[in-house]
Amino acid sequence: MTGYKLSMTEARTAYNAGDYFAAYEDLMGMDLKESDEDLFKKSRLLGDLQKKNKEYQVFVKRKMYDLALDSLVSGVARYQDNLDEAKTLGIEEEYTKEGDALVQLLQDQYGVSVDDAVSMYRLNREQYSIKIDEIVETWRRNHINP
């Protein structure tokens, strides 16, 4: 089996198993045939959301709540930004499942709505950081030292 075929097989296997980020990593940097471009695009969109969820989990375990919140806010904003592309690629169901998981975490843990997350994501870096810090400080008061 050639390197290309092996990489494509590994990527398809990961994708079909629901490990979209691994599929994306398998395809990243490859000179893809046109017929394989859709798998790359699907893996990129779904993998991005999966990665944000994994980042969130890691940051929470490390008690890095500002970075955890940032992962959710950026993930939810990207979810909204790329929803039309996901529909075009025919992955709306999977994409919505991954995105809704981020939305639920953001709302349940930090009380931040989708609209607020998208608005925050559009702020300049300084304003964004200030907003993240404000939300985390409120969260800490309510969860760590109630």
Could you say what each language-model-derived stretch is?
Residues K33-E34, L49-P146:
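Non-cytosolic head/periplasmic domains of membrane-anchored proteins
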Residues F21-L39, S119:
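Repeat-mediated protein-protein interaction surfaces in helical alpha-solenoids
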Residues N16-F21, Y65-D66:
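TPR-repeat structural position
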Residues S7, F40-K42, A86:
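Canonical tetratricopeptide repeat
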Residues S7-Y15, Y24, R44-F59:
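Conserved small-residue packing positions in alpha-helical repeats and bundles
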Residues M1-T2:
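Hydrophobic membrane-insertion alpha-helices, especially the h-region
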